UniProtKB/Swiss-Prot annotation:
Protein name: Three-finger toxin W-III
InterPro entries for the chain: Snake_3FTx, Snake_toxin-like_sf, Snake_toxin_con_site, Toxin_cobra-type
Entry's family note: Belongs to the three-finger toxin family. Short-chain subfamily. Type I alpha-neurotoxin sub-subfamily.
Membrane spanning residue stretches: none
Superkingdom to which the source organism belongs: Eukaryota
Naturally occurring in which organism (per UniProt): Walterinnesia aegyptia
UniProtKB keywords: Acetylcholine receptor inhibiting toxin, Disulfide bond, Ion channel impairing toxin, Neurotoxin, Postsynaptic neurotoxin, Secreted, Signal, Toxin
Length: 83
């Protein structure tokens, strides 16, 4: 019984990862680097780039969104990989 209980505790710890949250950069364009803790178990970061009347625009954040044609998208799976 003790072995079963210990096994359940270990499996729970491994599955929950002790509350660790995934971290991605979230600064826009040429702003100083900032990060955000991703919610909902998200484990990907993205960087979107496009040009408009303001010039070259960069957006960073958690997840991997769907983008329109003409927008460059880079999604990655390690923390802070989207700088």
């Amino acid at each position: 019984m003790k072995t079963l209980l210990l096994t359940l505790v270990v499996v729970t710890i491994v599955c929950l990862d002790l509350g660790h949250t995934f971290v991605c950069h979230n600064q826009q364009s040429s702003q100083p680097p900032t990060t955000t803790n991703c919610s909902g178990g998200e484990n990907k970061c993205y960087k979107k780039q496009w040009s408009d009347h303001r010039g070259s625009i960069t957006e960073r954040g958690c997840g991997c969104p769907t983008v329109k044609k003409g927008i460059k998208l880079h999604c990655c799976t390690t923390e802070k990989c989207n700088n």
